Structure formats: C-alpha cells, structure tokens
C-alpha cells in the first residue's frame, strides 16, 4: 500500500512524498519539466537518480523548507 502526499506543484514540476512500509531513506519524488528523480534531505538527488533540470532545481530551491518538512513528516 502506497500513499501519495503532494508537497508542491509549480511551473509543471511536482514534488510528492510516497509512503509505504518498504521505502528506504527519506526522500521526495520530483516529476515534470525534467527527469523523474528524487530529492533527499540534503536537497540533492538521491544516489543513482538523475540530476534535476533547471526548472526542477528552481522549484526545489524556492520551496525547500516545505519540501524538507514534508519529507520529515512522512518519514517519522
């Protein structure tokens, strides 16, 4: 069972947290206007995942505090 929580959607970029019992290190999924990738608690793509596009990076930087809070909330 997986639950999705949209953290932000801006300029075609979505950042979601998907929670399940076997989901690994805390992160959020980043989609739209670039590759499907993930962002970890350090603000960077998770190891082995694609780099952010310029548009994705702008949205992540602008919304970093709420993204980080969303990741922490769902991975307590």
Task: Specify the residue positions occupied by each region the protein language model found.
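Catalytic toxin/effector domains delivered as secreted proteins or via bacterial secretion systems
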Residues: 1-76
